[in-house]
Amino acid sequence: MPRDERHTATIPYGTLGIVPLKSCSKMGEKVDDYLVQWREQREHENQSNLAFSGYKRDSYVVSASTPRFGSGEGKGVLNDSIRGYDLYIMVDVCNYSIEYSLCGTTNHMSPDDHYADLKRVIAAAGGKARRINVIRPFLYESRQHKRSGRESLDCALMLQELTAMGVENIITFDAHDPRVHNSIPLKGFESVSCTYQFIKYLLLGVDDLHIDSEHMMVISPDEGGMGAPNRYFHFCFRLISSLSQIIL
């Protein structure tokens, strides 16, 4: 069965809703535009099925905001109904460009602030969404995945806290250590590898790059990231081998 037909044969888990927080607003717009175009172009025989109600829409974005009181405390607000929705909340905890005012002083949002806003939006859903998924380009507290002394296991605590609030799936990219999934073994956890994208734009953006043993060295910043250089090396090796075969 062709790939597109295989996806068409499945029934949506619920009405799709994308909730991009302020830190991920531009990415959310691009994802929304892609989904609108992709679903508009698809043809399938189940369009009249009740399960496909709302399958094609002008936008899948659910309006949400995280305003703050004068004291600096915040709250999460969903401006649209999400009852029965399959929600995908997008947040970039490393976006330091977002600012807020506190006591007349402008502050930049820290990863802790972004994480707090994420929990507020989940709480605003009030258990009415059919499923809640969280997409984070950078896994919050991923570097604190193990103990080397009297330390808190913040990454595991964060994952357990989100799943306790009703999150079913967590999607991230190149997690520092994907084995942190052990803290929530019965929930969905996806760490998407970005090796192809890194190599692609490295080759497109660096004109004088020579991929060979004489001119290139891949260095890991720490022990936890040792897997990435290995992936880059093997991917580059396969790429060069493929290009050599094409040229020959």
Which positions does each model-derived feature cover?
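PRPP-associated nucleotide enzymes
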Residues: 1-248
